[in-house]
Curated annotation (Swiss-Prot):
Binding site for ATP: 142, 151-156, 459-460
GO molecular function: ATP binding; ATP hydrolysis activity; helicase activity
Keywords recorded for this protein, A-Z: ATP-binding, DNA damage, DNA repair, DNA-binding, Helicase, Hydrolase, Isomerase, Nucleotide-binding
UniProt protein name: DNA double-strand break repair helicase HerA
Transmembrane segments: none
Gene giving rise to this polypeptide: herA
Swiss-Prot/TrEMBL domain comment: Contains an N-terminal HAS-barrel domain, which mediates interaction with NurA, followed by a central RecA-like catalytic core and a C-terminal four-helix bundle.
Activity regulation, per record: ATPase activity is stimulated in the presence of linear double-stranded (ds)DNA. Helicase activity requires the presence of NurA. LhrC-Core (Hel112) inhibits the exonuclease activity of the HerA-NurA complex on ss- and dsDNA, has no effect on the nicking activity of NurA.
Amino acid sequence: MIIGYVIGQATTQEALILAERPVRLGTYVVLEYDNVKALGLITNVTRGSPMLDDNMNDIEIVQRLKQFNNSIPVYTKAKVKMLCDMNNHFLMPDIPPFAGTPAREAEDEELKSIYSQDGQIRIGSLIGKNVEVKLNINSFARHLAILAATGSGKSNTVAVLSQRISELGGSVLIFDYHGEYYDSDIKNLNRIEPKLNPLYMTPREFSTLLEIRENAIIQYRILRRAFIKVTNGIREKLKEGQIPFSTLNSQFYELMKDELETQGNSDKKSSAKDEVLNKFEEFMDRYSNVIDLTSSDIIEKVKRGKVNVVSLTQLDEDSMDAVVSHYLRRILDSRKDFKRSKNSGLKFPIIAVIEEAHVFLSKNENTLTKYWASRIAREGRKFGVGLTIVSQRPKGLDENILSQMTNKIILKIIEPTDKKYILESSDNLSEDLAEQLSSLDVGEAIIIGKIVKLPAVVKIDMFEGKLLGSDPDMIGEWKKVEESEKIAKGFADFGTEIGD
C-alpha cells in the first residue's frame, strides 16, 4: 500500500516523504528504485497546512477560514531512516532515492525475513505488526544493556529473556537487588543465598575486602601469609574429616586471629599487625551475614537450563558489592579454566545480569564489582561469559562499560541527559532513533546491536506470572490492613466484655 512519495533531496541515510494519509512513528516502509529495495523506518512525523504556516499570527483569519471552509488543506511529512537494501545482503543503500519515489508500507513477510528467521529467542513483536522479533542468542556474549525510565518495563524484559534463555538450556545468573525475581513465577528458577566463602577467595581479593591499600606492602604480606596458612590448613582438615562443619566459621575467625598475631611478632611489624587485626575484626563484623565457610562455591550452585537468582535484598551495599564481585570473578576464572583444560571449571556459558547497575558500575565511584564487570566486558566473550546491565539511570553508568555493551534494549527514556549519554556511548544508535525514546509506551523498546539484524521498534511480550516489581495494589492493601484492624479490635472488645 503506497503511503507517500519522496520529496526534496534524499541521501543514502535518510529521505523525506509527503504522505497521502496520516502515518505512525515507527512504521516500516519500502522504497524501490534503480534496482534498490530499501527498507526504511519512519522516525519523525509532522503535519501542517500551507494556508496556516508558522508565519500565521492572526487568530481571526483562522476563525474565518474555519467558518468559510471547515476542510483546511493539510499535509503530512515523514522522515525515513534508511536501514538496508534488501536486494544487496541487507547492506546500506549506495544510491539515494529520487524525488517522486513511492514509499509503501513494508509487508509482514518482508519483515519476517529480517526479524523472525535468524534468532532463537522471541522477545516480542514489531509495534503495529504481526511480526515476531527473535534475538540471536550467540550475540549475548557481546553483552547487553537494558535501559529505561522507572516503570517502563525493565523487569518484565529481564524476566521474559531469562525464562526463554533457560528454556533453550541456557544459564542466567541474576543479581536481584530488590527481590523482584527471587520470589517470582519464573519457570526453571534456582534460588541462591548470597554467601562468601574465604576458601574460594584469593589473598588479594580477601585483602581488598579488608580495605588494605595496595601500597601497604607489609600489611598485605602479613595478611597473605596468615590467610594462605589458615585456609590451606582448613582444607586439609576437611579432607581428613578432622574438623566439623558446624565449627568452621568460628575456627576460621580464631585461627586467623592467632596466625595474624604470630605473623606480626617482630617490633618492626607490630604496628602493621595491629592494623591488620583491626581491619580483620571490622571485616568479620561488617560481613558476618555473608561469610560462611560451609557454603559451596558459586560454580557448584549455578545450574544449566536455570534462571539462577541471587537475592541481595538483605544486604547493605558494601556486602552486595563484595558478593557480586566475588561471584563475577569466580565465574570468569572458572570459564577460563574450562577453556584451557576442559577438565575443570564451569562447563557451560553463562549470562550474568546486574540489576541497578548504576549502583555497582557508577562513573563516579570505584567498586569491586565495577572492576570485575569491566574485565568481563573486555574478556568475557572469548570465554562464554555474557554481561547484561540493567539501569534506570543511564547517565550514572561508567561510560567505558556502557560503551562495551554492543547490544541495547532501550525502553522509554524521558530525561534528555540520559538520551544524550546513551547516544554518545552507542556506535549503532542514531540521533533520530534516540529522539523516539520519549514517545515509547510502557513495554515498548528500540533494540539495536548484533542480537538483531537491523534496529527494531518492538512491543516486548508480557511476562506471564508474578513479578514483585509490579505496581502494588495500594487500595487492596489498605483494605487488608483495615480488615485486620477491625478483627483485632473485635477480639479486644470481646475480651473486655468477658472481663466485665
